[in-house]
């Protein structure tokens, strides 16, 4: 309903003004009509479903903002929302680099036919994830920015549905000054994006989704470099809100403002309590109805 849309916008506006009061500059992208069909010579998509999270398409490393390839057809044109802001940054800052990865064709060759069929049970899906057998093929480089975490000169990239090995290789070749490490999380039957799975909180501390633990051999990279990985607290909810396309583990997708301050969704009391005990100042943010 229109009223609830106004309410949802108000929640985002409140979050934005809270950040601004703390001295953080907040830029808001220009929304498109996400309901419109899109097409290329290779395919047609009925809507631009999912084209709203800036975190998913823009990868910021140093003075560069890179537009990711994206791997959903409906999100192919998502970058258009951010072009006005990117143009502004480019004009205002002589050192800003605006880059774009090669746009993938996303033909049928990019996807395994029937991979997402309802006939396939959860055990088989978990086995596939463990074997790194995903819905996307290695036809061409694919990656979403939301699969990447930056730790100084190290980029940690989740290999899963939305990022393939060719995409990780492309990032390695592109970021010559960085070390790129592939990670995967066998407990997730639908591995899309790293943010509700593996979250750095402050230097030396990462929270990891206990249902999707980083495999033992991959933990060494972090532990050998002084990073402790602990299980994230349980979510406060048993299911996501209506029409929400994310899991209940959005509870751990927090916003770290500085090494001592973190924003947590206000209903996620267990996650807030855990971060409080870890010495963080927790800012509760009312955002669940805007997911």
Listing of model-derived features with the role each one plays in the protein:
Residues 1-291:
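The feature marks the mature, well-folded catalytic cores of soluble enzymes
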């Amino acid at each position: 309903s229109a009223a609830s849309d106004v309410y949802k916008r108000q929640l985002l506006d409140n979050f934005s003004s809270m950040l601004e009061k703390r001295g953080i500059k907040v830029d808001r992208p220009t929304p498109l009509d996400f309901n419109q069909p899109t097409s290329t010579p290779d395919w047609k998509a009925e809507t631009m479903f999912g084209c709203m999270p800036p975190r998913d398409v823009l990868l910021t490393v140093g003075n560069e903002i890179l537009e990711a390839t994206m791997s959903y057809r409906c999100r192919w044109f998502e970058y258009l929302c951010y072009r006005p802001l990117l143009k502004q940054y480019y004009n205002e800052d002589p050192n800003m680099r605006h880059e774009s990865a090669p746009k993938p064709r996303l033909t049928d060759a990019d996807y395994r036919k029937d991979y997402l069929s309802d006939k396939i049970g959860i055990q088989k899906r978990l086995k596939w994830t463990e074997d790194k057998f995903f819905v996307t093929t290695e036809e061409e480089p694919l990656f979403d920015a939301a699969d990447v975490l930056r730790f100084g000169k190290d980029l940690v990239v989740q290999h899963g549905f939305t990022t393939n090995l060719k995409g990780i290789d492309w990032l390695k070749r592109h970021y010559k000054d960085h070390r790129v490490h592939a990670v995967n999380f066998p407990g997730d039957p639908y591995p899309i994006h790293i943010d509700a799975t593996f979250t750095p909180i402050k230097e030396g501390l990462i929270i990891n989704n206990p249902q999707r633990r980083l495999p033992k051999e991959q933990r060494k990279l972090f532990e050998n470099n002084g990073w402790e990985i602990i299980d994230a607290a349980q979510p406060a909810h048993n299911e996501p809100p209506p029409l929400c396309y994310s899991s209940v583990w959005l509870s751990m997708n927090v916003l770290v403002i500085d090494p001592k301050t973190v924003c947590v969704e206000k209903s996620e009391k267990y996650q807030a309590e855990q971060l409080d005990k870890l010495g963080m100042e927790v800012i509760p943010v009312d955002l669940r109805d805007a997911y």
